């Protein structure tokens, strides 16, 4: 029997960015999953704040070179990779000079949210899925962490609907309280619609706030993991109304075993038993 395959798509990951709850889990969970006998692939954005020399990132030429159109402009997709020696795992980075070269993450030096963070999110999501397809690697579970990954379910359902590499994958959305104030560019839905996602599927992000994007990810996934002790009130309300497997927040210890048991239940079709 082949090993289960888990694709991790994460907004933040240590040691490449400062540690938060999300970046810590996104670092330790893939390692633990690998140690439990599953195959993994890990993707994150190559934010310009990441020190390429220190972490020994290098470009994967055979995976780079595709152009992704966002907002009527073609942007070259660059794929880089690095290893975490202590974990014996590789991390793939989605890169592009327009979106990720700036020496920052999501905000400028004055704390202002970048006005193109919506496009950066769309480029990241599509870049990951296009790269996984190019790798010819079919995941059983796609684990999404952070609001930047909230569009993954819609892209899989509508843009990659006929892609055999994804047709059996279960989507897990890991919901955190690590968000932002205000809203992304109001044209985000239209930009995603141009990729082939129906307008009615995007109506909830006519105003792309953190809560609306988080809700989109939770509603579109096959299962939800709660990654923060306290989600926002809006997030809690969405969670309470979901009719799907949910793994409650369980603290900062023991999550590898709990989440992998959740994976196993999902793959065996028995998740209702752990969805309290």
Label each region the model flagged.
Residues 1-276:
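Catalytic cores of nucleotide-sugar-dependent glycosyltransferases that transfer UDP/GDP/TDP-activated
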């Amino acid at each position: 029997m082949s090993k289960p395959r888990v694709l991790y798509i994460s907004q933040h990951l240590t040691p490449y960015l400062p540690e938060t709850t999300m970046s810590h889990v996104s670092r330790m969970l893939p390692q633990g999953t690998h140690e439990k006998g599953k195959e993994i692939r890990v993707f994150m954005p190559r934010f310009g704040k990441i020190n390429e020399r220190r972490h020994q990132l290098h470009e994967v030429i055979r995976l780079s070179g595709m152009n992704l159109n966002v907002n009527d402009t073609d942007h070259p997709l660059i794929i880089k990779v690095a290893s975490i020696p202590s974990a014996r795992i590789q991390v793939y980075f989605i890169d592009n000079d327009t979106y990720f070269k700036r020496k920052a993450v999501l905000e400028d030096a004055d704390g202002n949210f970048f006005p193109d963070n919506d496009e950066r999110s769309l480029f990241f999501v599509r870049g990951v899925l296009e790269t996984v397809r190019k790798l010819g690697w079919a995941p059983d579970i796609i684990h999404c962490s952070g609001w930047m990954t909230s569009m993954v379910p819609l892209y899989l359902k509508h843009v990659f609907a006929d892609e055999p590499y994804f047709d059996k994958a279960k989507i897990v959305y890991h919901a955190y309280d690590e968000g932002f104030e205000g809203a992304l560019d109001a044209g985000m839905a239209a930009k995603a619609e141009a990729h082939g996602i129906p307008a009615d599927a995007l109506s909830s992000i006519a105003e792309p706030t953190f809560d609306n994007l988080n809700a989109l990810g939770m509603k579109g996934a096959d299962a939800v993991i709660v990654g923060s002790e306290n989600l926002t009130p809006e997030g809690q309300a969405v969670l309470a109304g979901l009719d799907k497997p949910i793994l409650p927040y369980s603290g900062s210890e023991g999550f590898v075993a709990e989440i992998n048991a959740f994976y196993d239940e999902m793959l065996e079709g028995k998740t209702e038993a752990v969805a309290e």
